[in-house]
Structure formats: C-alpha cells, structure tokens
Amino acid sequence: MERIFNPRQFGALGDGITLDTKAIQAAIDEAGIAAERGAKTIVVLSKGIYLTSSLFLKSHMEFRMEEGAILLGTTDESQYPIMHTRVAGVEMEWTVGILNVNGQEDVKITGKGCIDGQGPYWWNKYWGEDRKGGMRKVYEAKGLR
C-alpha cells in the first residue's frame, strides 16, 4: 500500500519566508512510522519555496520534490544542529547539512525540484568578504584544508 505525506498537511507554508523545518520533518517522521509498518511511503514536496534547516530522512521512503518545489536552506546558523563527525580526516563538531540519511537504508530523493543551500552565503562565511578572513582561519587551525 502506498501512502503519500505532504508537509503542507503538517503545517508547511512553502512561502520562502516561514521556517518549514518542523512541518517537513513531521511528515518525514510519520512516513517513517508508516514505512516501519510495511507501507510504501512518499513524502511529496509540492510547488513552493520551503525554508528549512536540517532534515533527517528515514528508511524505506521516497522524498519527492515536484517541479517548482524548492528546498531553501536557511542562513540562520542557529537552526542547524551540530554533530560529531569527520571532515577531511579530522574528528570535529560540524553543522549538519540540509538533507541527511544517517544509518538509514532504501531512501530515494527524486523529482524535478531544486535544493538551494544558499551557497554564496556559506562561501563568503568560509573565505570572508575580503577573501582573507572568515572561517577558513578556524579550519586551518584544526588542520583542515
């Protein structure tokens, strides 16, 4: 049996202004529960701009982004959790990305939508506006290149 979960049914607005992380994650979590019970689950992001931070996909699900759906990563750094990880061979605490599939299996990310992580913001944060400062100095001190 196939079950569709639309984050709008969980309160997502898709207006590009409201932070929709909790609503999208709620849809993902419900899909995960249904998948554990044997259902084929699909989380469908319909047309809209969904401002979000980190999302954690579950096993045995499809995350489908329809044409015109944009998953827009927030630049509010306080919204991203920090996890212990390894970056360039160095153990450290690091912020989590937008879409995460940790310890899960049989996960599909499909569709014609777009994931926009707002790269220029993070690029400038790393290099600094003057291309000499920024977070690069912090990373280099930890042995990252």
Question: What are the residue ranges of the model-derived segments?
Answer:
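Extracellular/periplasmic carbohydrate-active domains that bind, remodel
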Residues: M1-R145
